[in-house]
Amino acid sequence: MAERAQTASAAGTEEETPQPAGTTDNPAEQNSQAENQTDAQQEETKKDFIRWVDFGVSKFAMTEAYEYDRDTYGTDAHISWIDQLAYTAAYTGGSFDSDRTVCQYMDKLREEISQGKTLEKLVKDLEYFSYYQEAYTAVLGGMVGEYEIETADEDGRKSWEKRYGLKAFSPIAKGFPYTDYDDFGVSRSYGYKRNHLGHDMLGQVGTPIVCVESGYIEALGWNQYGGWRIGIRSFDKKRYYYYAHLRQGFPYQPELKEGSVVLAGDVIGYMGHTGYSTTEDVNNIDQTHLHFGMQIIFDESQKDGDNEIWIDCYQIANFLYRNQSEAARNDETKEWRRMYLMKDPAAEAYERTADYSMYP
């Protein structure tokens, strides 16, 4: 269950961040820690924002909710996939282990809406709906919407097509094999003992890595834990996507820099096994893979430090497999680029008002 103001939770850190201070369940120790907080820290504790998210939505549930969202868009029967998931979670306590139960609650909501009832009325007395709606919006909010994408006919002629649907992509380009399993939370020991707060996708050196959601580059370069890595922030600033252990020598596209706007489906880098070294461009990771992480941010105080929220994105990665970006190789530059361009209204809106003065 979520915790809001008055209750601070340490959510762990990404691979590049120092180990956070420990927490305790002992009330006496908690009081002692509170007394030792600075005024600024105590002020942060009083803010009203979500401090913990345990994202357990299954691929099945995301698929069911998304397809109904897409298929009913523009009709009176339309319900966003996030509202369907939040409604279900409010009844199940956030559990999506039973596909049958998921269908039961989603079907119930859809039937009520089709009879003319409003979502507002249906959730009025549903205690935790508002929490799950806010939490799931923070996780999934930029993945579905209106966009334009290039398509090609049988003769290869391209044209633009307006769509509503999934506009987020798998982190791995189409046609490139990879294997994965749910490894979130397993132990890591390089530098310090910690839990693995991402999702490893194992493949071949040079596999094109794709931007999952449109956003802007917030971090780029070498880190001793993540090796060559890219950090991309969503335009609403709720999500931070972390792509690590990129290829030695040629980790990412040469034009990228901090502040660059990237679109979902763009090839941003290449799989490798760099990292675990204070020296740049060193391969100290045994297995070639992409470390893909998702950090959720409700308040900027959660971006770095003891209160970071990293979610298990295994189910999300599997859901996004349905939408892989096709890429083609330029033999002269050895770069891979997406084959079909995209126009994202969210990116266009951001670029109209963005302040780039903070970037070199």
Regions found by a protein language model. Give the residues of each.
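Structural recognition of the beta-strand scaffold that forms the well-ordered cores
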Residues: D200-L202, I209-C211, G231, Y240-A244, ...
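Surface-exposed, glycine-biased beta-strand/turn segments
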Residues: K117-W228, A264, L320-P360
